[in-house]
Amino acid sequence: MAVSLPLVFTAPRRGMPPKHLADLDSTERREAVKELGLPGFRADQLARQYYARLEADPEKMTDLPAAVREQVGAALFPTLLTAVKHLACDGGDTRKTLWKANDGTLLESVLMRYPDRATLCISSQAGCGMACPFCATGQGGLQRNLSTAEIVDQVRAAAAALRDGDVHGGPGRLSNVVFMGMGEPLANYKRVVAAVRRITSPAPDGLGLSQRSVTVSTVGLAPAIRKLADEDLSVTLAVSLHTPDDELRDTLVPVNNRWSVAEVLDAARYYADKSGRRVSIEYALIRDVNDQPWRADMLGKKLRKALGPLVHVNLIPLNPTPGSEWDASPKPVEKEFVRRVLAQGVSCTVRDTRGQEIAAACGQLAAEN
């Protein structure tokens, strides 16, 4: 088993990146523009360039006077993320991007194209403090929180790449965003919620994706799940449960020592009731660890009792990580697990695994240069 790491809820005190337009709400944008000595209407103009035209370089904003572009760039459009490299697999349909922030911090995002949609998996932190032993990100520890703009800019860059046909499959449109990359989103709560609002608000306030096409994942920070429910968003909540019993979950998902399975499912039910959305339960199936028939039965019973019809189980065949002695359950075991969960009246499917050979799959992101 991997070395046990401490839980880290508060990010190390490292300098955050300079303010960016995407950090600001509409009122703050207008104030920032006026501080530059520009008329107020420029605020919406700049926001439309960024959110609607997906343009992050003021030098290319032709409706902005050339004389002020450099000033605007320095004040509102600092370069936050630089692509270090792209890796592709699955016939080019999966592309992982390694980003370097302006302080040298590394993070990753993964773009996945399907026949009917394009999904971007984004990071909310550099590293992760939740210390799950089967996850490469968790084993690397937490470096720092990402800013709202660093989160949003991952999405803008992917949307622009799809629009411009820079990825395999020709021009397309970004349809889904999942906060399932590096980090525990609810441990960077304020910035993640602000990013969700930027991603889903229509221009000039955001990128205009449907809230229902955005998924926010968590290992189970129960109070933060309840807080998210009270934001009155309709994003999908995904809970990384991985086992239905506290004894094993205390090890697999160390945050369980703080909030038990029952507390997490109770918070998830509150979210489902408030949002009207079905909660997704993520379950990485690990050979001889959490794949026993009795655990499938227990999972189905607990979920049916806690969430009724407002739940769906995503089984994830464990993706290999360096140094781990664990591997995925055999297909017959996986099939029987699904059958048993379904027999309890709970929806359950096996997730299509993408990006394994480029370490872009669930639990593999380690931001290695």
Swiss-Prot record:
Transmembrane portions of the chain: none
Broad class of where this protein is predominantly found: cytoplasm
CDD domains from the UniProt entry: Radical_SAM (cd01335)
Signal peptide limits: none
Locations listed in the record: Cytoplasm
Keywords: 4Fe-4S, Cytoplasm, Disulfide bond, Iron, Iron-sulfur, Metal-binding, Methyltransferase, rRNA processing, S-adenosyl-L-methionine, Transferase, tRNA processing
Annotated ranges, domain Radical SAM core: 114-351
Reactions accelerated catalytically: adenosine(2503) in 23S rRNA + 2 reduced [2Fe-2S]-[ferredoxin] + 2 S-adenosyl-L-methionine = 2-methyladenosine(2503) in 23S rRNA + 5'-deoxyadenosine + L-methionine + 2 oxidized [2Fe-2S]-[ferredoxin] + S-adenosyl-L-homocysteine; adenosine(37) in tRNA + 2 reduced [2Fe-2S]-[ferredoxin] + 2 S-adenosyl-L-methionine = 2-methyladenosine(37) in tRNA + 5'-deoxyadenosine + L-methionine + 2 oxidized [2Fe-2S]-[ferredoxin] + S-adenosyl-L-homocysteine
Residues that, per the record, bind S-adenosyl-L-methionine: 183-184, 217, 240-242, 319
InterPro entries the record matches: Aldolase_TIM, Methyltransferase_A, RNA_MTrfase_RlmN, rRNA_lsu_MTrfase_RlmN/Cfr, rSAM
Gene Ontology BP terms: rRNA base methylation; tRNA methylation
Cited NCBIfam families: rRNA_mod_RlmN
Its job: Specifically methylates position 2 of adenine 2503 in 23S rRNA and position 2 of adenine 37 in tRNAs.
HAMAP family cross-referenced by the UniProt entry: RNA_methyltr_RlmN (MF_01849)
Note: Reaction proceeds by a ping-pong mechanism involving intermediate methylation of a conserved cysteine residue.
UniProt record similarity statement: Belongs to the radical SAM superfamily. RlmN family.
Protein's name according to its UniProt entry: Probable dual-specificity RNA methyltransferase RlmN
Gene name, Swiss-Prot/TrEMBL: rlmN
